């Protein structure tokens, strides 16, 4: 029987191990036993906490999205202007917890697996909608709503594209360059627009 009070710790260890295992293999073709071994626990304990691989994978993805949402809420609360809000959204998407080699590989694997999994597809759609709405909220204070939607769509595509590009590269992810590229894109798109920020 698992020790009382150990469940949250063990669940987190298994989720972290799932990110590492999926990231290392670049595939969801992993077993609960492999993830449990990476976490240093028994496969039986992993099954006890999650009930199987699919539930563990979904819990891992939800964990990454919760982390992203929590960090974003903190960053946005510190933003005082639309430009600061946009910068905060971009920076959080390329934070050290999200834009790490194994996490990037895990995200890419989730995108591929979404073609076969309605649950993963739904979670990715929630993520995309939240990113889009957060960007639009700030952008429409600087330009028209139609243009804000178009810029947000482009910025979201750039963020996803940069994750894919870094997943394919051998070098360590360069968050500063990624942030600069997305910020430059938004600045260029906004250039020549009358600013509503005063």
UniProtKB/Swiss-Prot annotation:
Function: Repressor involved in the biosynthesis of the osmoprotectant glycine betaine. It represses transcription of the choline transporter BetT and the genes of BetAB involved in the synthesis of glycine betaine.
Record bears the keyword Repressor: yes
Species of the source: Brucella abortus (strain 2308)
Keywords (A to Z) from UniProt: DNA-binding, Repressor, Transcription, Transcription regulation
Ranges for domain HTH tetR-type: 8-68
One Pfam family from the record: TetR_C_6
Cited PANTHER family: HTH-TYPE TRANSCRIPTIONAL REGULATOR BETI, HTH-TYPE TRANSCRIPTIONAL REGULATOR RUTR
Pathway in which the depicted protein is active: Amine and polyamine biosynthesis; betaine biosynthesis via choline pathway [regulation]
GO MF terms, alphabetically ordered: DNA-binding transcription factor activity; transcription cis-regulatory region binding
InterPro entries: BetI_C, DNA-bd_HTH_TetR-type_CS, Homeodomain-like_sf, HTH-type_TetR-like_transc_reg, HTH_TetR, Tet_transcr_reg_TetR-rel_C_sf, Tscrpt_rep_BetI
Domain of life from the UniProt record: Bacteria
Name of the molecule in the record: HTH-type transcriptional regulator BetI
A GO BP annotation: glycine betaine biosynthetic process from choline
DNA-binding region listed in the record: 31-50
